[in-house]
């Protein structure tokens, strides 16, 4: 029995560990360190219809317990992803999750329609929560009606299940999650980064050229856990949880909150081996906690019954 195997819409994962979009590129750099086939999946870099060069520099700043980024969805564009990046990834035994972004609803629809045809793309991650672009991005993820409409339009053209990435920069994340579920989403991924800022002590000006950026890393984990805990009790579609995950213990905490799989982001910048290390350590942790299978941990913090030994 594979104690870590997870079945989600469109995704048969050998384990629930997935590098998060934006922190792993298209996997080329990390393939120098280990066989990417050990992973559950990869959420590839956000793809837009046309190439994007991103925001001006500086666009990364360290913070206590994390980092701020304002990359601005830099990517080579749909054609390059379809003709180069995705074919390269076919050498690995991996179902790919393609992150889809855009400035207008029509952009999302166009990218989703084409990229979902790729043979190794098994699901889409609809990026309606990037805080670092002036148009699109978070604008779609902070209004329930707009988020639902975009979800419905993408579902109509996608050939694979659609997961929607939620923003934490909202007053009521449950309301948005339920609207997206009602629009036909197959799953949710959460959370994206929290909007933040750092100021230079000598100039009193923002360190980032974009002024603000998305906060990620261990500092946001308690927020992510709280939001997964709330949303998982309100919807009937699976959640891929993310936000500050660095260890096997972090993974179990997200499962307890209600996640069915997890994505590891900023930690990849600190330790390129973090994902395989977590995968290796999870079975021993399950033994220690008295579980036969990782699915037994899902929603344990709020479910009335559990199946621990």
Curated annotation (Swiss-Prot):
Active site: 130
Pfam families, sorted: DHO_dh
Residues at which FMN binds: 21, 45-46, 99, 127, 165, 191, 217, 243-244, 265-266
Biochemical pathway: Pyrimidine metabolism; UMP biosynthesis via de novo pathway; orotate from (S)-dihydroorotate (NAD(+) route): step 1/1
InterPro entries tied to this protein: Aldolase_TIM, DHO_dehydrogenase, DHOD_1B, Dihydroorotate_DH_1, Dihydroorotate_DH_1_2, Dihydroorotate_DH_cat, Dihydroorotate_DH_CS, Dihydroorotate_DH_I
EC identifiers of the protein: 1.3.1.14
Family: Belongs to the dihydroorotate dehydrogenase family. Type 1 subfamily.
PANTHER family: DIHYDROOROTATE DEHYDROGENASE (FUMARATE), DIHYDROOROTATE DEHYDROGENASE (QUINONE), MITOCHONDRIAL-RELATED
Protein name, UniProt field: Dihydroorotate dehydrogenase B (NAD(+)), catalytic subunit
